[in-house]
Amino acid sequence: MGCTRDAILDALENLTADELKKFKMKLLSVPLREGYGRIPRGTLLPLDAVDLTDKLVSYYLEAYGAELTALVLRDMGMQEVAEQLQETMSKGPRNVLAEVRDPLQKTAKPGLHFVDQHRAALIARVTVVDGVLDALYGKVLTEEQYQAVRAERTSSDKMRKLFSFSPAWNMTCKDLLLQALRDTQPYLVDDLEQS
């Protein structure tokens, strides 16, 4: 899905310096979906189009990052650029924006992912979270997300904070979490798989 990143970058590179500044200011106040954190103002404001694209994708992943970019562009009155972005998305191998608009379609299927199915038990029973975080750092978690989870005091609070980022994850991210849990807490994972 690298085409999504390219589409976001194309849209942002079409903005003038003033429009890019306005985009960043609007991005600071646009309502976000539950589970998504806001990019800090100090981090956001100095970014150019390339770095901003990277930051959008790392914070919101490609699908929601593209939707958010289109939303902010529309809010700025730049319908044409927003439509070009959405058009590029719908021409991709699969319609990324439609996938973002209907995320419940996947979770409504009977085969919930292990980490979704056992969320409550994982929050309550995972005792060593740091090893899990280290495995996810850079692949699933950004530096800010990693530090936010580490800042929590108890293991259950750390797991709860970790799960607060999960609405932005795809199956690969959840598979990486499961693998990290298998590596650090194999007996717990075995017990939950048998329950």
UniProtKB/Swiss-Prot annotation:
Its main location: cytoplasm. There is a cross-link at residues 55, 174 (Glycyl lysine isopeptide (Lys-Gly) (interchain with G-Cter in ubiquitin)). One of its GO terms (biological process) is positive regulation of T cell migration. Residues 1-91 form the Pyrin domain. SMART domains: PYRIN. The modification Phosphoserine is found at residue 195. It is found in: Cytoplasm; Inflammasome; Endoplasmic reticulum; Mitochondrion. The keyword Nucleus applies. Phosphorylated. 'Lys-63'-linked polyubiquitination by TRAF3 is critical for speck formation and inflammasome activation. 'Lys-63'-linked deubiquitinated by USP50; a crucial step for NLRP3-mediated inflammasome activation. 'Lys-63'-linked polyubiquitination by PELI1 is also critical for speck formation and inflammasome activation. Deubiquitinated by USP3 that cleaves 'Lys-48'-linked ubiquitin chains and strengthens its stability by blocking proteasomal degradation. GO terms for cellular component: AIM2 inflammasome complex; cytoplasm; endoplasmic reticulum; mitochondrion; NLRP3 inflammasome complex; NLRP6 inflammasome complex; nucleus. Residues 107-195 form the CARD domain. GO terms for molecular function: cysteine-type endopeptidase activator activity; pattern recognition receptor activity; protein dimerization activity; protein homodimerization activity; Pyrin domain binding. Keywords: Apoptosis, Cytoplasm, Endoplasmic reticulum, Immunity, Inflammasome, Inflammatory response, Innate immunity, Isopeptide bond, Mitochondrion, Nucleus, Phosphoprotein, Tumor suppressor, Ubl conjugation. InterPro entries: CARD (IPR001315), CARD8/ASC/NALP1_CARD (IPR033516), DAPIN (IPR004020), DEATH-like_dom_sf (IPR011029), NLRP_Inflammasome (IPR051249). It comes from the Eukaryota. Functions as a key mediator in apoptosis and inflammation. Promotes caspase-mediated apoptosis involving predominantly caspase-8 and also caspase-9 in a probable cell type-specific manner. Involved in activation of the mitochondrial apoptotic pathway, promotes caspase-8-dependent proteolytic maturation of BID independently of FADD in certain cell types and also mediates mitochondrial translocation of BAX and activates BAX-dependent apoptosis coupled to activation of caspase-9, -2 and -3. Self-associates; enforced oligomerization induces apoptosis, NF-kappa-B regulation and interleukin-1 beta secretion. Homooligomers can form disk-like particles of approximately 12 nm diameter and approximately 1 nm height. Component of several inflammasomes containing one pattern recognition receptor/sensor, such as NLRP1, NLRP2, NLRP3, NLRP6, NLRC4, AIM2, MEFV or NOD2, and probably NLRC4 or NLRP12. Major component of the ASC pyroptosome, a 1-2 um supramolecular assembly (one per macrophage cell) which consists of oligomerized PYCARD dimers and CASP1. The CARD domain mediates interaction with CASP1 and NLRC4. The pyrin domain mediates homotypic interactions with pyrin domains of proteins such as of NLRP3, PYDC1, PYDC2 and AIM2. This is Apoptosis-associated speck-like protein containing a CARD.
